């Protein structure tokens, strides 16, 4: 204790404190030395020729990694530049047709820029041009492509009819080919001579359009000749009747629009009255079987004039109290024609406008006006023309003025029994007799169906 209080003791304490502070100072110096040593070691480690192998190996590994990263970055940069260039090329090719077009804007600046992305389909379409069909990128078979021919693109696949396909596969089996195209090639080779004789498409003659227009006229002329009843001037009378047929049609119905076949059902009374005597003489001098001979040459399904052969089916159920409209009294020279023409009659309650009685299954016979027949007897009934539900109400507007005009224009000198046939298809063939003949189509008389009866239009 005394030592701590004296002077020496104080010095000892100071020495103790100095001793404690000395290690602190060494520690700071050591740290500075270590930093200098670390710097030296780092500077030595960067040198590959140093004696320290560990430091040199780590440095080389680091440098190699950095080099690989630099190469990868360079490759990515090149790929990006290539994509940029290809995208700009596509944009240029897309804008080029628009600038060439008539309404394309010629500006076409680089505004907006290219996205740098392109699809394989766009690239192929650009490379091969528009309108071409290219196989898929996977190289699959192109089963739906078309071939370019002289008349444009056509499908490669050909669809055959059933019987044609059966015959073709039979030929293929007989030839022993495994593919239909080989059989087609064989057929083309064997038919080469016939194919060479065919004209080219440009040299092929046009289809005869005039033949289709001349065919109805030839048919009409043949019909008028066969039903002219011995008239040598049937062509002239037919043309005159067709020219004057529109005079009886009302103007409101548009007579100029009505076809010649409809006009032929209504021959002019002036032409009929002018040729009444000639037609009556020709009709009188004709043989009794003229009707059967003239109608046998035509098809029953088309003209419906085989009334004589089918009269046992058509008129078998008509009542016996109906009087005959055509008799042999007014036509001398036909002694045996009265029995043959008995079937051409109309019931007593039938009117002059051609409406038959019964169940509505009647035939229209517009007969010449007799002496003493007034207009009240002609239009005794005001009902429209009917035929088994067929809409013939529109024909009333044609028949009424025709019948009235026939009454006013028929000469009084014509006998009541004189009968002449008006031309049914082409005009007035035999004079002022029947003004029309209409046979309704597909009528049934008590369960029996008429065969080959149609309406002559």
Curated annotation (Swiss-Prot):
Oligomeric form and interacting partners: Forms homodimers and heterodimers.
Compositional bias (Gly residues): 101-115
Phylogenetic placement of the source organism: Eukaryota, Viridiplantae, Streptophyta, Embryophyta, Tracheophyta
Positions with biased composition (Low complexity): 210-225, 268-278
PROSITE patterns documented for this protein: TCP (PS51369)
Name of the molecule in the record: Transcription factor PCF7
Origin species: Oryza sativa subsp. japonica (Rice)
Subcellular location per the Swiss-Prot or TrEMBL entry: Nucleus
Job of this protein: Transcription activator. Binds the promoter core sequence 5'-GGNCC-3'.
